[in-house]
Every structure is written in C-alpha cells, then in structure tokens.
Amino acid sequence: MNIDTSNLLNSILEELSSLSYVHPGDVPNINLYMDQVTTFMDEQLASTKRYPDDKILTKTMINNYTKNNLLPPPVKKKYSREHLLLLVFIYYFKNILSIKDIETVLAPLTEKYFPDGSSFELADIYKEVCKIEKEQLDSIKENVTATYEKSAETFTHLADGEDKEILQQFAFICSLSFDVYIKKMIIERIIDDLSSKSSKNEEKK
C-alpha cells in the first residue's frame, strides 16, 4: 500500500495512544440531574465522536435505557455515580451489541453491585476494567500493524497503481472486519450462556 495509507494508519495508531476515556477519578461522587449527566458525558467522551454532530448521550437515550432495564431508575430525578458508570459501559457496548444483549451483560452488575453498601462497588469494577483495557492497547496496535503488513502482501501480481491500492485497502478492511466479526461472535456466545444460566436460575425460584 502507498505512503498515504501508511501515514493514515500511523495517524490512527497515534490517536489510539491518546484515546481518551472516562477516568474513574473523574466520575463525580454526587447525584446529578439529567442535564448534568448529558453534559458530563459529552465533555468526557467528545473525542470519541466520529462526526462533530454525533450525540454521545441524550435524554431520550437515558429514558430508553431505563425503560429497557439497562439502567436503574433515578432517585428523585437524580443519577448517582453508579448510574454514570453504567452509562459509560452502555456507550461502548451499544456500538457492537443489541439492547437485549447489553441488558444481559449488565444485569449481574445492577443486581449485585449497584446498590449503596454493597461489598464490592461498581466503581471498583470500572477501575479494574480500565486497567485491563490500558494494558491491551499496545498489543492491539501491534496486531493492527501486523494485519496491515499482511494485507500489503496481497495482489502483488498487479502493477503499482490505483487498482492495487484499492484492493490492498479492501483486503485490510476485510481482515480487520473478520477480526471484529469473530470477537463479536465470541461475545454473543458468552452472552447467550449468561442468559441461559439466568433463565435456569429463575426457574428454580
């Protein structure tokens, strides 16, 4: 692939290095009204937008999450730190999972660790997950680079030019998409298992 594509990839990988996320210490430990929640999420996750007009979180989204049992209802119209942490998880999950799947994934958290006074707080879970994700970033970048280099070895029988560039880029996109597809399938199988176990536990009650 040509220099422009290589430069684009390097630029993207540099962005990954500085990828912002909601740091555990930045989540306010006070109850917020809905307007304050949407403002907080917009400020914290603005850099993750693909387009400037993209919405991070709206009032309608929050109400729908509550309606679909992803998010416990607010107390006297106020949302706690635990609500905010769940909303961060939902924000990332919704890009790859259905609402029903997100409900299944978050159900154990909302049932066991959401209430105040629980032995293991949701904030502790969030911190642990953030730690894992930061540790994975370097290996993800290495994997993407290796995939790029492998894709650059395709269609070598073609002369250098637009056709070769387009097809090598297509091969790169396909390889990345296949990786996403396989990982998404694994996630869905795990979620199906969680759902099955949950149903069996309900039947025993």
Predicted regions and their residues:
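Polar low-complexity intrinsically disordered regions
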Residues: 1, 37, 201-205
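Basic helix-turn-helix/winged-helix DNA-binding cores
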Residues: 2-112
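Intrinsically disordered, low-complexity, charge-dense segments enriched in Lys/Arg
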Residues: 108, 112-205
